[in-house]
Amino acid sequence: GLREMETCNGVAMVTDDTQMTIYTAQGLLYAGKKHCDYGNTVREVHKSYLRWIASLLPTEDVFSRYESMYPREELERNELLENGANPGLDKKMCRGGSTFRALLSGQLYSVSNPADEGVRCGTTMRSAPVAIYCYKNPSLAFRLGRDCAAITHGYASAYLAAGVMCMVIARLINGSEMEEAIEESLDYLKTQKDGEELYAVLRKGVDLSRHPSEKPLNDIQTIGLGWRADENLAIAFYCCLRFGRDVKSALLACVNHSGDSDSVAAVCGNMLGAYVGEEGLPSEIVESIQFKELLCQQANSLFSCAVSSLPSSS
């Protein structure tokens, strides 16, 4: 299996997970700049996702499907790609699935108006910026993470998993230990409608980390393959708790299993990054990442404009 970061000409190329994370962050930054209320914050993230999919599918007239919802000229303004910025960010890296279908539907889905499908981890792998934007209020991080995930995924365990992950990261930013952040977030999940299935899967990952076998990959296979959002987050919990601040070992366990390894590693890395900080991350990984400057700039900007509350939409 992998032992070191794979690079191309010294650059560790990102996947669609990072693409969508960047567009999530950009939507939140627009919302912050406009001082949006809660509902319009979700809409700014939705608009950002539409810009993302339009950049990947230039032959599809994505924006015409939303003419009754958003001004076309606003959707067409994509600062991430203006004047040749961030080359490679518009490279299609995934087959589509639930996320593509929802974004091409002409609708804005929500928890109360759910998409027809969507159990997979397209929710968790893109949602970390929500946690930074809402780190001052972990409950708000949960709610906004959930609702931004429901833009594309209609299955409760999928959008709730994004909420749980955002709450964990928000707690970590505030100085909680990993186990404390996870357990408190699981307690919160128990109060949420339709959270029972997700809770059981996440609890399995946590419990396995406390009584691990000699081979992490065996434990990971017991949890699942990570394609589903609930299994994805459960494996990430297991790796974070089993390896603690040993970031490299945790990420190696994520990327060397036979399932959706890049997305599991993305979610695990998001949580560990919040836990150990930049100084605790292996320098050989950090320095080689594609779009590193953009990612750092977005994270710093989100932190600077972070909110403790968002007014309800009128």
Where are these regions (language model features)?
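Structured, active/binding-site neighborhoods that engage oxygen-rich ligands
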Residues: G1-S314
